[in-house]
Amino acid sequence: MASLIYRQLLTNSYTVELSDEIKTIGSEKSQNVTINPGPFAQTTYAPVTWRHGEVNDSTTVEPVLDGPYQPTSFKPPNDYWILLNPINKGVVFKGTNRTDVWVAILLIEQRVPSQDRQYTLFGEVKQITVENSSDKWKFFEMFRNNANIDFQLQRPLTSDTKLAGFLTHGGRVWTFNGETPHATTDYSTTSNLPDVEVVIHTEFYIIPRSQESKCNEYINTGLPPMQNTRNVVPVALSSRSITYQRAQVNEDIIISKTSLWKEMQYNRDITIRFKFGNSIVKLGGLGYKWSEVSFKAANYQYNYLRDGEQVTAHTTCSVNGVNNFSYNGGSLPTDFSVSRYELIKENSYVYIDYWDDSQAFKNMVYVRSLAANLNSVKCSGGNYNFKIPVGAWPVMSGGAVSLHFAGVTLSTQFTNFVSLNSLRFRFSLTVEEPSFSILRTRVSGLYGLPAANPNNGNEYYEIAGRFSLILLVPSNDDYQTPIMNSVTVRQDLERQLGDLREEFNSLSQEIAMTQLIDLALLPLDMFSMFSGIKSTIDVAKSMATNVMKKFKKSGLATSISELTGSLPSAASSVSRSSSIRSNISSISVWTDVSEQIADASNSVRSISTQTSAISKRLRLREITTQTEGMNFDDISAAVLKTPLDKSTHISPDTLPDIITESSEKFIPKRAYRVLKNDEVMEADVDGKFFAYRVDTFEEVPFDVDKFVNLATASPVISAIIDFKTLKNLNDNYGITRSQALDLIRSDPRVLRDFINQNNPIIKNRIEQLILQCRL
């Protein structure tokens, strides 16, 4: 039977070339190592004496916390928070545009009973009633929108950090209110924002609005420890306008030189453009189910001007630490569901590998010092329509994150033609508004960026910044140091697999049913599976080895290992013998599972839940107790074989992933049955269950305990023709008891006879199974 291919893979009995094993170990070590990026990134040293170098700061990157500044009066820039850090009580801030905004912030000490105090506000002496019953400091925001009315207490802020904030943005003036550590922002509207001027009576800081989350953090939890020492001296605000000697956009500085080598410092302003890649996979069936919505690495090539020079750059964007979610609208075939959709949020990272054609990247092999500064960028998600056949389409929309520079190290990008020594910039994430939701479902109000439409129609996102590094390079500028081997998050294998998946799914729809049955009956092994693939005769053994090594990490192989882990003799026979059937019968690997399910049934009373849990294990039980009938894995292997023979994208690198993926994703909607005399018990992975008689197809009560006992002691059969199809066939055409038994046992000869007779019910069932064989 064709499923022999999967059983052979599960034996893990294969030979390996020593050179292949060494290559694999080296690759796995590179891929699994955790890089802690710091101010230095080093590779192999070269024969020179290293000397110190300088790293020029860049004016293209705004500091998060700028200050402290001395008390002053000025016209505040839009989109910048003014963080007030008063020491003494009294008036700490005044601001007005002389038309519709007059705002003053007063600081009241702790434990003050209600009393009247005099304050001078905008040249007027005002008597204001204040009180503070708290052990924290209290800011009174006094506001009026007309020069002829009195000030009113608008938004008090009770604070143990003694920090307040003020911002002009979007036709509004913003302040903080509430009580720390849960203070929030609020605003007053103005029609004349550009004319707002402020008088500040205390030390203050300036924070860009793009870092509002940091400002919120300072207000609620206090300034960083370094800002609370007496070594930090406030300076005049005019110091912001001092003209600095700005470093050049491109700088090549010789630090030292010998006869053959020289140390070079390269300083570069860079523009990084990147985009997210994604993969949306739809399950087979009626068109209401999606398998995954996931992030994929994406590369982007572009040109930009840098100091009058045309630069060609290449970036690769990948993500790490994704969060997996799922949505299931119900168990019916017409209920919308997404088995897995990915989301990036605060615990995730984004990696961007950057390369350009400048001299800095020509000899990036021996690197001593590496530093960088980059601005932040906000990435907002767009809409994605799940196009179901009938009814209003569910729409995944919204979601946003901001990327903040968190480190830089060395990497290598693999393009279609060449490997590029690159810089990898790591970004931490903060979630932003809006939240995302799936319209017409109960999913709403979640934060993060989903993989459905992460680019939101934009060709790319853009970040400006600067890097500086010191390299050891040949004294002869025309010589290029050979590139050293390296492994990155993104490899071209993903692109090849994407092309292969599309081709595979297209070819699988062209399979003739009689061809499928014939292939399903063949005893396909490793080498007959590869026989139709061109140019693989010389590498058949290596390819088989690669497939087996990949397959042993698959979900199916892991499940078998878990079942046999506590049974040494059974595990030994599974991993070493040529056939999984041998010696399994003496110690049933199903025993532990049935006991676990029996225990679960005591706490979970839903028969549907129990049968669903049992059915997901029945595939493993079927593998260990083969029958003469055709099973789902026979169909999977047959569908796998046909497109492989016709594929133009198959290669030794992609084949292991395709075979492993097929074992996990093909025919997700499976049903299994056990047969006892004239009674059949059948259950599927969605929790549907039937018990019926062979002669009449009359349903009888379903007993879970009996089903478990039968599945433990009797062979498990794939319900290729499930109960509903059998009943439909009997009601419309009438079938004999012998035919019914053959179909229940999934006899391939009887299936072929019905297909040759063009029986529409049987053909439709087989077509639905083929449609579920998608990557």
Curated annotation (Swiss-Prot):
Residues 247-478 are annotated as: Spike body and stalk (antigen domain). Residues 483-515 form a coiled coil. InterPro entries: ConA-like_dom_sf (IPR013320), Rota_A_VP4 (IPR042546), Rota_VP4_MID (IPR035330), Rota_VP4_MID_sf (IPR038017), VP4_concanavalin-like (IPR000416), VP4_helical (IPR035329). GO terms for cellular component: host cell endoplasmic reticulum-Golgi intermediate compartment; host cell plasma membrane; host cell rough endoplasmic reticulum; host cytoskeleton; membrane; viral outer capsid. A motif (YGL motif) lies at residues 447-449. Pfam families: Rota_VP4_MID (PF17477), VP4_haemagglut (PF00426), VP4_helical (PF17478). Residues 65-223 are annotated as: Spike head. Residues 509-775 are annotated as: Spike foot. Disulfide bonds join 317-379. SUPFAM superfamilies: Concanavalin A-like lectins/glucanases, VP4 membrane interaction domain. The keyword Membrane applies. GO terms for biological process: permeabilization of host organelle membrane involved in viral entry into host cell; virion attachment to host cell. A motif (DGE motif) lies at residues 307-309. The record marks 230-231, 240-241, 246-247 as: Cleavage. Keywords: Capsid protein, Coiled coil, Disulfide bond, Hemagglutinin, Host cell membrane, Host cytoplasm, Host cytoskeleton, Host endoplasmic reticulum, Host membrane, Host-virus interaction, Membrane, Outer capsid protein, Viral attachment to host cell, Viral penetration into host cytoplasm, Viral penetration via permeabilization of host membrane, Virion, Virus entry into host cell. Residues 388-408 are annotated as: Hydrophobic. It comes from the Viruses. The keyword Transmembrane does not apply. This strain probably does not use sialic acid to attach to the host cell. Belongs to the rotavirus VP4 family. HAMAP family: Rota_A_VP4, Rota_VP4. This is Outer capsid protein VP4. The lineage of its organism: Viruses, Riboviria, Orthornavirae, Duplornaviricota, Resentoviricetes.
